[in-house]
């Protein structure tokens, strides 16, 4: 019995590791939009048309924005919209159409105590959080991914361009995004 359960688990794990590509047609206007690929691994949120990071609401939720990547172990299908893929691309990602020529703030969180995954394991590591901002240009393709260099969480943003049959990458300058200030109403009215 144990051997059969182990075989079923091994087969499920093997199949979960096979990323599929779900290609979606997204409304994309090169004159007003940009595209961005976000790699899985760290919890990642987009905040549109702001250079600061909105405050989270009750229990860590809210603050607007959009969750674009979360660590996951079961649903590993990529969502693609036709962006070029560089040779060094990670295996699992989602792609999005975003407004160009407006600031995009990206927050990334990694670590901390997490809930048990489907195997019953609990992963614990130091909680790290960063937020960065940049202005995507119209008609350009980007990718964003977290890295952990020197035990410090980093956000990397690269611009993609196709030259001949190759996809080239170029680092994009990003700035720290502070927490947004809560504006209190003026008591004088």
Predicted regions and their residues:
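Sec-dependent bacterial lipoprotein signal peptides
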Residues: 1-21
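Short loop/turn and low-complexity linker motifs enriched in small/turn-promoting residues
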Residues: 18-127, 131-133, 141-189
């Amino acid at each position: 019995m144990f051997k059969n359960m182990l075989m079923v688990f091994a087969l499920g794990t093997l199949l979960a590791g096979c990323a599929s590509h779900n290609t979606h047609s997204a409304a994309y206007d090169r004159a007003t939009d940009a595209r961005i690929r976000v790699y899985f691994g760290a919890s990642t949120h987009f905040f549109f048309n702001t250079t600061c990071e909105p405050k989270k609401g009750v229990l860590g939720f809210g603050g607007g924005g959009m969750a674009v990547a979360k660590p996951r172990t079961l649903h590993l299908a990529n969502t693609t919209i036709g962006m070029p893929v560089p040779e060094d691309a990670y295996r699992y990602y989602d792609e999005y159409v975003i407004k160009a020529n407006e600031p995009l703030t990206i927050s990334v969180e990694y670590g901390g105590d997490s809930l048990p995954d489907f195997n019953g394991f609990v992963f614990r590591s130091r909680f790290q959080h960063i937020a960065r901002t940049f202005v995507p240009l119209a008609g350009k393709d980007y990718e964003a991914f977290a890295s952990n260099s020197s035990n410090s969480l980093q956000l990397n943003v690269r611009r993609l361009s196709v030259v001949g049959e190759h996809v080239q990458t170029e680092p994009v300058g990003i700035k720290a995004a502070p927490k947004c200030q809560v504006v209190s109403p003026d008591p004088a009215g």
